[in-house]
Amino acid sequence: MSLLAYAAAALAEIAGCFAFWAWMRLGRSAWWTLPGLASLAAFAALLTLVDSPAAGRTFAAYGGVYVAASVLWLWLAEGQRPDRWDLAGSAVCLAGTALILLGRRG
């Protein structure tokens, strides 16, 4: 459930932020901000579904997922193929996510 929540949260956050990007940078209507705000609220709610007793650890692990999902958005939504640095950076961030999620505690 946690991986699905992270993926859904990333999609919601990126879509919400892109709505504001579209308004402020691409000249789209300010009406784009309404679904953007709803998407950002969904993002916050989705992170509460992650099975973790600590918000900070949840947010830190999510960061790597966000970076990788943003690079995927770059490619699929914006039509710009990621370069090797985008992919390498995403891999490093996902390795950090794995360390946070799978590291032994105690």
From Swiss-Prot:
This protein's record includes keyword Zinc: no
Topological relation to the membrane, as annotated: Multi-pass membrane protein
Keyword Transmembrane: yes
Pfam families membership: UPF0060
Intracellular or extracellular location(s): Cell inner membrane
InterPro entries in UniProt: UPF0060 (IPR003844)
Stretches of the chain forming a coiled coil according to its record: none
Annotated source species: Methylobacterium radiotolerans (strain ATCC 27329 / DSM 1819 / JCM 2831 / NBRC 15690 / NCIMB 10815 / 0-1)
Family from the record: Belongs to the UPF0060 family.
Keywords: Cell inner membrane, Cell membrane, Membrane, Transmembrane, Transmembrane helix
Protein name: UPF0060 membrane protein Mrad2831_0929
Annotated HAMAP family: UPF0060
NCBIfam families: PRK02237.1 (NF002586)
SUPFAM superfamilies: Multidrug resistance efflux transporter EmrE (SSF103481)
Transmembrane segments: 3-23, 30-50, 59-79, 87-104
One of the record's GO cellular component terms: plasma membrane
